[in-house]
Amino acid sequence: MPLPQPHDLTTLVLRTDFGDDAAWEALCAALDGADAYPCATPVSDPRFAGAGIQALLAEESAAGEDERICEVFLADATALAGPEHPLLAVDLFTEPGRTFRVPVRWYPEISANLSIANMDFAEYADAAGPSGTFRGFGDD
């Protein structure tokens, strides 16, 4: 079964940790408040509980060409536990399985640029710091 499709000009935020509903609600509220325009399609489906990167890649590779998405942002235990809600960005297309973390503060910029193909996943992943977290391009 393919991954859910994000709404137009947004990217998919997929919940994989179901241990704290309040943390999920806080993350969704942070995403809603991060930008004046919707930038996320949050999906909370228990079938993705504990889903790892390889399982998501397998699901996506089995999807039809017109059902595939290029990236997904995971709301995993780390994202739900941290005050910055660092989502795990996963490349599903160019370099399948490549990841970096992105705090909600930078999510709207990344989502917008990826959804219109203004920038690609690698540009953000390459700019991630030593911890693997993207915190802007240095002039932000």
Residue ranges, per PLM feature:
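Short helix/strand-capping turn motifs
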Residues: 1-122
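Short linear, low-complexity motifs centered on an aromatic residue
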Residues: 132-140
